[in-house]
UniProtKB/Swiss-Prot annotation:
Residues 295-397 are annotated as: RNA-binding. Residues 579-636 are annotated as: Integrase-type zinc finger-like. The active site is at 457 (for protease activity). GO terms for biological process: DNA integration; DNA recombination; proteolysis; transposition; viral translational frameshifting. Residues 1151-1165 have a biased composition (Basic and acidic residues). Residues 1625-1767 form the RNase H Ty1/copia-type domain. Its main location: cytoplasm. The capsid protein forms a homotrimer, from which the VLPs are assembled. The protease is a homodimer, whose active site consists of two apposed aspartic acid residues. GO terms for molecular function: aspartic-type endopeptidase activity; ATP binding; DNA binding; DNA-directed DNA polymerase activity; RNA binding; RNA-directed DNA polymerase activity; RNA-DNA hybrid ribonuclease activity; zinc ion binding. It catalyses: DNA(n) + a 2'-deoxyribonucleoside 5'-triphosphate = DNA(n+1) + diphosphate; Endonucleolytic cleavage to 5'-phosphomonoester. Coiled coil: none annotated. This is Transposon Ty2-GR1 Gag-Pol polyprotein. The gene is TY2B-GR1. Residues 1-86, 360-453, 1004-1034, 1059-1135, 1146-1165, 1170-1205 are annotated as: Disordered.
Length: 1770
């Protein structure tokens, strides 16, 4: 009955009622705790509605059921509960009580009290639901209340009824917990428990009773279900289920923290500063807010803080917005410094302001004029400026800067007494002007200007006028340099005075500057103040200091103006443009010239553009306009011929509402056929709807990736340059626009893609019209200039530049003016195709001409230069070093353009740039290698005249070209390679002097230097030899047998053009022969037919004698004592870098004199094809065949193709199977062999648990392993490797997430026994790790480089070890491991918490962990490109997993790093390295002996002594030691290998062990063995008896030489630079399948730090190709090592490359761009040119007998092997 009555009451279902309260929360801006009594009826009404809907299901309650609370209990209270509270409420005696509220005790320990009679304690189920209104808990126990009668007596609209209070609503979600806590605390306060609730500091007013504690516990449990509590609350209750007050305390603290964070963010977002308070106070306020947020783990970046501060700046400080608008790396300290400077300036200016400047209070903070200044003011924005500097000038809004104007004679300007003028920023106001939020542009619309008036500007420190009509005593400017607020130059043409005649006859004069590059004429109040004239903006007058009114001023718009009627005009002729003197009768420019210079634009556009100042340095009155409107340009008629006019007005009207750069039109044009592959076939154009600004981008195809790259570029450009975001892009429905890739790109960036309707091109009129206009211009420009069609896009780009600069008929401004850019500087424009002469900064010879004919295309977008096409080189360059060629017209003869010569007019227009160019030309020295702003791939090859009797020569002035009559005035359509007038073939050589000809190729420009003398160098030959001992002025007698050894026997080289160098044959007489040559481009060294003749001289080789002159064929700047042929780059330091400096200190062999009959080098690079030659694993040759060939073995495609084909077929069919698995006659054997190779497992060096402990019979070793086992277990538990609180059932976990584990045991090199618990990462599922993560370790080259630098700089070397390094890295994935089998937990799993050894991701996790710690805590930075190499100003660290090597000049710096590491990691010091005596290290397997300031020795004797005998190789420890790892002439038989499958697997396994160990040793330090190791490694799958014997021989040699060490000695302390050298070599065709072996050795300061030997990936057809391949492999690593050395040691670095191939050096030097016969090696050669020229790399020749890289490419005789290696390894 009672239950039925309760159900009939709508308030009885308290769970629903409380839920309704939750849904009816107070507004977000109101405190939920501040609910007044007036709000309660709404809560009750909503509760009634919800409860009425749930009457049919009364059993569903939000409060968990608890049958223990049905009646009072005599036991301790409260007892365990059901649900989650029951689980966590049960506490064992072993559990510690972690509550901070110890004085509350624990409810389970309390005695029973009468609090249980409280209604709040009754069971919240359908039988005894909690009442909606609960009587407050008083200090005395309340009387029992009849629940049945209670609810009928409770009013509905009051917070309290008698002693009843409103209970809190039930918690409905974890996210609402903080809000619920507020209601719950309000409930407790209303229940008379407010004085026991702790505040945010954990303080209480009194202690609560047992009854109160139980009351709080039960109410909290009733209204806060456990499964809806936040995690942090659950963690507290899991420790002590009754510790509710701790939860409340932390909740209050969190709420207050969140409120404070919100307040701080609001304060930071609403910062405002106008200078009314001190800058220091403002800085302290902002810094305090940021620091407070940082303490709450909220980091505010400098960029975000600067943006928020800048947004709130106003007044004089608003200037900083524009200054920092484009900066990406904003620093908060710099911004505060700028604010402090402006604040100090204003403070000083207010103190110094004269009384006549006192104005109305409205303007008191606007004017910042500084009077009484006799000199021009210097105002900068450098925050390092002292407070004593002069005040900053205000912004002149209308300054239009010219980015094209270059500073001339900067040194003179800097030394002059006239200082730079800085105009103010965009957002400053002139005196008396109202502040506006809109930012004025550089070029203001003419509607804002008051005609015939001067704008009065308080901030401009100088008066600027656009016309020289009022300028008196004008003189050309040569000193003053004006810059605007953006620090861009404003060109000043002249300096003079303005004379005023005011109303009362008062006359005065002020200084003024003339520049046409501004929008308004500016009148500086500062200049007037010097004449005691001030402006009164209250009466709008100019007044003298005594109050006399001189003239009225007018306010127009936002500015004040003074009429020009008070100016006295000058009586001089108009000042010329660019300081070019004019005669009294001004010559006007002919309209056809201007029409051509401005890209053949129409008459109206040109005229309107000049009126609107869209083109600077040229006015409308300067042009002869007679008959201009009727002028018909023949090129325009031909190029722009159309069928009908384009549809106009087709775009939608709503597009007008967009802001600039928000609405773009785009379209693609193309393809253009019959063009070279390097020329673009398409272009994509963009047009802005608002400004009509245009962009064009070249395209080679229409693929999605290409289009996407263009869109990415244009959007980034608009965002960064114009601070705008594109909203809509209109385009057609071509597939290049409608694809999914581009659609997704637009969607991700919030851009609307607007497509045209089907078959409606009229809706796309803007883009279509632009393409048509650009193509019309393109055709016209190409037709007018006569340039080849592959330059069509240059014409389009030129047209785009012009079109953006001209005013369209429907616009009042040009596109550039609409975009806020300066007008087009016409002095920087040349007519398209204008003939010019370009300076060659690096000619082939000093006597060769310095000028190259070219044709101007368009201004460069990336520099201040001009893009010029050079037909002779078939390329374009970006340069400023050019001269306009006079009397050259690129006009069509059929239209009789010869009568139109514009040389004088063009000179006047470009006078400024011409003077700049001529000054550069005269200042450059032709005898020095100077840097140029255009990039040639190498110096220009220009053949000179043949040698004459007079050896003296002079440099040819490029301007002398004008004296030569030129019949062709237009560039040909098809450019001839011989276009240069100076390609003169050499004449017959004087027979009296037996010179060796080094003729240059006229086809390709390539040169092959040799040890022979070229006639073009003879002029310098005599002078050079005059300084040599024993030299004379006479030519050397080449037949002398006692003087010269040319070192050239049977050597013949070929240039790219096919012209062969002299064929030098051993002969007793000097004979001159003639041989035909072939003009086919080739890098082959073989002979070929030709139509021309080349003299060939055979010279017998002579012995080298000291103090004897020798013929040097290299140019003077390339010569060295070692006949080096360098590729000197135009670097300032190149004059100090010679072959001697590169070769100095290198461990090269000391050669003895050879007899004339020595033939050791005769067969260099000759591929040997022996009659019995088989596949040689060592690439050897039969010595008997060395001297049998007297002709070159280099193959000619025409003559010897058949012969080589036969030889190659025989080679392949009979002898070349060494790289394949053994081919048994039965196919089954081959398949079995392949399967056997795949099943081979790596050599295991560790022991399993059963092997190390269970069945180990060695008790001592077993005890050590057991000890190691327990140590590993302790470490794992200490590091919390897995979750120890719970074991997981194997059947409940996804098998993919389960990783097998095991213990492995091994014995370390130092004798200690090690146990490690590892995961089976080899069977880890791919879904459980990120395959992109990398486990990085230090590269061996980085370690060797660091050791070398440490030796040269006397560094201390400290070795550290971090114990269990991987276990410091957390694991992100959910993984489980099986416990080791011996633990007996087969069906259980452990949840991993740390990166266990063996997991795929463990290495990467550890790397990221230690990297973050080193960077953040140790102040280290990782060297870019070299992972695991960290450095700061004092210490360098090389990291290899858990091993650390520290290098430092100061040992204390190392100790400081160690101290920091020990705070986080268990760091063990292996070797501190503090001794001054020899110290021994074991670093990553290398045994190092190091004595600072003396030497370093690297070896592996101990390790090899231990490991080699264990390989089961029949070593001969007492027999005769091997002196070389192999001998030439040994070959591997290629007969079929018939072997049993098991035996085959066993031998392959053996080969893997032997070659694996040899490779480890070889790449560590035994670089002399790399060739043999690499060659034998290719035969691992062919383990014949012969291969095994050779492998045993290699291992025997390693055993015999195990004591050898890599020896380094400290570099000479006098060396100021680091010298990094790569020595390269290649052996042509000595590997299977006619492949070549290449090798490189790298040396740092004379110390060998690395080597590489490998087989070329491509089949080379000549020795030159093989050498190019070797060099191309060396240069990238050389550049990377150079970067590393510069990071580790800040000394300058010299990079050198040595090769014994002169033809390779010649190809690198050549400027020839014709195709190579082999496109693969042609690509390599072209890339080499770019890399050498762009990296300041010096390329020199080294003699073959000194080339230590020879040991990397071929087997050598014992004597040669020892000679090449004994200097660096012994």
């Amino acid at each position: 009955m009672e239950s039925q009555q309760l159900h009939q009451n709508p308030h009885s279902l308290h769970g629903s009622a409380y839920a309704s309260v939750t849904s009816k929360e107070v507004p977000s801006n109101q405190d939920p705790l501040a609910v007044s009594a007036s709000n309660l009826p709404e809560f009750d009404r909503d509760s009634t509605k919800v409860n009425s809907q749930q009457e049919t299901t009364p059993g569903t309650s939000a409060v968990p059921e608890n049958h223990h609370h049905v009646s009072p209990q005599p036991a301790s209270v409260p007892p365990p509960q059901n649900g989650q509270y029951q689980q966590h409420g049960m506490m064992t005696p072993n559990k510690a009580m972690a509550s901070n509220w110890a004085h509350y005790q624990q409810p389970s320990m309390m005695t029973c009290s009468h609090y249980q009679t409280s209604p709040a304690y009754y069971q919240p189920d359908p039988h005894y639901p909690l009442p909606q209104y609960i009587p407050p808990l008083s200090t005395s126990s309340p009387d029992p209340i009849d629940l049945k009668n209670q609810h009928s007596e409770i009013p509905q609209a009051k917070t309290k009824v008698g002693n009843n209070v409103l209970p809190p609503h039930t918690l409905t979600s974890e996210e609402n917990f903080s809000t619920w806590v507020k209601f719950y605390i309000r409930f407790l306060k209303n229940s008379n428990l407010g004085d026991i609730i702790p505040n945010d500091q954990g303080e209480i007013k009194r202690q609560m009773t047992y009854e109160e504690h139980a009351y709080i516990y039960n109410t909290f449990q009733a209204f806060a279900p456990f499964h809806l509590l936040p995690t942090w609350v659950k963690q507290i209750l899991e420790i002590n289920y009754a510790d509710i007050l701790t939860v409340l305390c932390k909740s209050v603290s969190k709420m207050q923290t969140n409120n404070q964070e919100l307040k701080d963010w609001i304060a930071l977002a609403n910062l405002e500063y106008d200078g009314s308070t001190s800058a220091d106070t403002f800085e302290i306020t902002v810094s305090t807010i940021i620091q407070r947020l940082k303490e709450n783990n909220i980091n505010v970046s400098d960029r975000l803080a600067c943006q928020l501060i800048l947004k709130g700046l106003s007044g004089d400080f608003k200037y900083l917005r524009n200054q920092y608008r484009t900066k990406t790396n904003m620093k908060l300290s710099q911004l505060f410094a700028e604010i402090q400077l402006i604040y100090d300036e204003n403070k000083i200016m207010n103190l110094n302001k004269p009384s006549q400047y006192k104005q109305h209070s409205e303007y008191k903070n606007v004017s910042r004029t500084s009077p009484n200044t006799t000199n021009t003011k210097v105002t900068t924005r450098n925050y390092h400026r002292t407070n004593s500097s002069k005040p900053r000038a205000a912004k002149a809004h209308n300054i239009a800067t010219s980015s094209k104007f270059s500073r001339v004679n900067n040194d003179h300007i800097n030394e002059s007494t006239v200082s730079s003028q800085y105009l103010s920023d965009d957002d400053e106001l002139s005196l008396g002007q109202q502040q506006k939020e809109s930012k004025p542009t550089h070029t203001i619309d003419s509607n804002d200007e008051l005609p015939d008036h001067l704008l009065i500007d308080s901030g401009a420190s100088q008066t600027l006028v656009r016309s020289a009509h009022y300028l008196h005593h004008a003189t050309p400017n040569s000193e003053i340099n004006i810059v605007d607020a953006q620090k861009q130059d404003i060109p000043i043409n002249a300096i003079g005075n303005l004379h005023f005649n005011f109303q009362n006859g008062t006359k005065t004069s002020i200084k003024a500057l003339h520049t046409p590059n501004i929008a308004y004429d500016l009148l500086s109040l500062s200049e007037l103040a010097n004449q005691n004239i001030t402006a009164c903006f209250t009466r709008n007058t100019l007044e003298r200091s005594d109050g006399t009114v001189l003239a009225p001023i007018v306010k127009h718009g936002d500015f004040y103006w003074l009429s020009k009627k008070y100016l006295i005009p000058s009586h001089i002729s108009k000042l010329t443009i660019n300081n070019v003197n004019k005669s009294k009768s001004v010559n006007k420019y002919p309209y056809p010239l201007i029409h051509r210079m401005l890209g053949h634009a129409n008459f109206r556009s040109i005229q309107k553009s000049l009126k609107k100042n869209a083109v600077t340095y040229l006015k409308e009155s300067d042009i002869e306009w007679s008959n201009a409107s009727t002028y018909q340009c023949p090129d325009c008629l031909i190029g722009k011929s159309t069928k009908h006019r384009h549809v106009k007005g087709s775009r939608l009207k709503y597009q007008e509402s967009y802001e600039p750069f928000q609405y773009l039109h785009t379209d693609i044009f193309g393809p253009v056929h019959h063009l070279p592959k390097s020329a673009p076939s398409y272009f994509i154009s963009f047009t802005d709807e608002k400004t009509r600004f245009q962009w064009v981008y070249p395209l080679h195809d229409r693929r999605e990736e290409s289009i996407l790259n263009v869109f990415t570029s244009i959007l980034a450009f608009i965002k960064n340059q114009f601070n705008a975001r594109v909203l809509v892009i209109q385009m057609d429905r071509g597939s290049e626009y409608t694809n999914k890739t581009l659609h997704k790109f637009f969607t991700n960036r919030g851009i609307t893609a607007c497509y045209t309707t089907t078959a409606d091109s009229r809706a796309h009129g803007v883009a279509e019209r632009l393409n048509r206009t650009l193509l019309n211009d393109c055709r016209t420009l190409l037709h007018c200039s006569g340039l080849p069609n592959h330059l069509w896009f240059s014409a389009v780009e030129f047209s785009t530049i012009i079109r953006n600069s001209l005013v369209s008929p429907k616009k009042r401004k040009s596109a550039r003016q609409h975009a806020g850019l300066a007008g087009l500087d016409i002095t920087t424009i040349l007519p398209f195709g204008q003939p010019v002469i370009v300076n060659n900064h690096n000619p082939d010879s000093k006597i060769h001409p310095r000028g190259i004919p070219g044709y101007a295309l368009h201004p460069s977008r990336n520099s201040y230069g001009y893009i010029i096409y050079l037909p002779s080189l078939k390329k374009t360059v970006d340069t400023t070093n050019y001269v306009i060629l006079q009397n050259k017209q690129t006009k069509l003869d059929q239209f009789d353009y010869d009568t139109l010569t514009f040389d004088d007019d063009l000179n006047r227009l470009t006078a400024h740039n011409q003077s700049f160019i001529e000054q550069n030309e005269t200042e450059q020295s032709y005898d020095q290698n100077t840097e140029s702003d255009h990039d040639y791939q190498s110096e220009i090859e220009i053949n000179s005249d043949p040698l004459v009797n007079d050896f003296s020569s002079q440099s040819i002035n490029p301007l002398q070209l004008d004296k030569e009559p030129v019949q062709k005035v237009r560039a040909p359509k098809e450019v001839d390679a011989d276009i240069s007038e100076y390609n003169i073939l050499p004449s017959t050589i004087r027979s009296r002097t037996p010179h060796i000809i080094n003729k240059e190729s006229t086809e390709m420009g390539g040169t092959v230097e040799s040890d022979t003398t070229s006639p073009r160098h003879s002029s310098t030959f005599t002078a050079r030899n005059q300084n040599r001992p024993g030299s004379t002025n006479e030519m050397i007698d080449l037949t002398s047998q006692d003087r010269v050894n040319y070192g050239l026997e049977n050597i013949k080289t070929t240039r790219l053009g096919g012209t062969e160098e002299p064929y030098i044959q051993r002969n007793s007489d000097t004979n001159i022969k003639y041989r035909t040559t072939n003009s086919t481009p080739s890098i082959d060294d073989r002979s070929s037919n030709s139509e021309s003749t080349t003299p060939i001289i055979s010279i017998e080789t002579k012995a080298v004698c000291d103090n004897t002159p020798s013929i040097d064929t290299d140019p003077p700047e390339y010569r060295s004592s070692d006949h080096a042929t360098p590729n000197i780059m135009p670097d300032k330091s190149s004059k100090n870098v010679t072959a001697d400096s590169i070769l100095d200190d290198l461990p090269l062999p000391d050669l003895t004199h050879k007899s004339p009959t020595d033939t050791s080098d005769v067969s260099k690079d000759i591929p040997h094809i022996h009659s019995r030659q088989t596949n040689s694993s060592l690439g050897g040759m039969d010595d008997s065949n060395v001297l049998t060939t007297t002709k070159s073995k280099k193959r000619s495609l025409e003559d010897n193709e058949t012969e080589i084909e036969v030889s190659r077929d025989t080679w392949n069919n009979k002898n070349m199977r060494s790289l394949e698995p053994p081919r048994s006659k039965k196919r089954i054997n081959l398949i079995a062999a392949i399967k056997g190779v795949k099943s081979i497992k790596p050599v295991r060096t560790t022991l399993r648990y059963d092997e190390a402990i269970t069945y180990n019979k060695d008790n001592k070793e077993k005890d050590r392993y057991v000890e190691a086992y327990h140590k590993e277990i302790s470490q794992l538990l200490k590091m919390n490797t897995w979750d120890t609180n719970k074991y997981y059932d194997r059947n409940d976990i996804d098998p993919k997430k389960v990783i097998n584990s095991m213990f492995i045991f091994n014995k370390k090199r130092d004798g200690t026994h090690k146990a490690r618990f590892v995961a089976r990462g080899d069977i880890q599922h791919p879904d459980t790790y990120d395959s992109d993560m990398q486990s990085n370790t230090v590269h061996h080259y980085a370690l060797m480089t660091s050791l070398s630098i440490a030796l040269d700089n006397d560094y201390y070397i400290t070795q550290l070890d971090i114990s269990s390094a991987y276990l410091y890295a957390d694991i992100k994935e959910e993984l489980y491991i099986r416990p080791p089998p011996h633990l007996g937990l087969n069906d259980k799993l452990l949840r991993l918490r740390k990166s266990l050894y063996g997991l795929k991701q463990s290495g990467a996790n550890w790397y990221e962990t230690i990297k973050s710690y080193l960077i953040n805590c140790c102040d280290m930075q990782e060297v870019r490109g070299w992972s695991c190499v960290f450095k700061n100003s004092q210490v360098t660290i090389c990291l290899f997993v858990d091993d650390m090597i520290l290098f430092s000049k100061d040992l204390n710096a190392n100790k400081k790093i160690i101290t920091t590491l020990k705070k986080q990691y268990d760091t063990k010091i292996i070797n501190l390295g503090e001794s001054d005596n020899e110290i021994q290290y074991d670093i990553l397997g290398l045994e190092i002996k190091y004595q600072r300031s003396k030497y370093m020795k690297l070896g592996m004797e101990k390790s090899l002594t231990e490991k080699l005998p264990k390989l089961n190789v029949p070593l001969n420890p007492k027999g005769k030691k091997l002196r070389a790892p192999g001998q030439p002439g040994h070959y591997i038989d290629q007969d079929e290998l018939e072997i049993d499958e098991d035996e085959y697997k066993e031998k392959v396994h053996e080969m893997q062990k032997l070659i694996g160990l040899a490779s480890y040793v070889g790449y560590k330090f035994r670089f002399d063995l790399l060739y043999y190791i690499n060659t034998l490694a290719q035969h691992i799958l062919f383990p014949s008896r012969q291969v095994l014997d050779m492998t045993y021989e290699l291992i025997q040699f390693m055993w015999d030489t195990r004591d050898k060490q890599l020896i380094w000695h400290k570099n000479k302390p006098t060396k100021p630079d680091n010298k990094l050298v790569a020595i390269s070599d290649a052996s042509y065709g000595n590997q299977p399948y006619y492949k070549s072996q290449i090798g490189n050795i790298f040396l740092l300061n004379g110390k060998v730090i690395g080597g590489k030997s490998t087989k070329a990936s491509l089949t080379c057809t000549s020795t030159t190709e093989a050498e190019i391949h070797a060099v191309s492999e060396a240069i990238p690593l050389l550049n990377n090592l150079s970067h590393l050395v510069q990071e580790l040691n800040k000394k300058p670095i010299i990079k050198g490359l040595l090769t014994d191939s002169r033809s390779t050096i010649s190809i690198i030097k050549s400027t020839n761009e014709e195709k190579f016969r082999n496109r693969f090696f042609g690509t390599k050669a072209m890339r080499l040119r770019d890399e050498v020229s762009g990296n300041n790399l010096y390329v020199y020749y080294i003699e073959t007998k000194k080339n230590i890289a020879d040991v990397m490419t071929k087997p050598l005789p014992i004597k040669t092997f020892k000679l090449l290696t004994n200097k660096w390894i012994h």
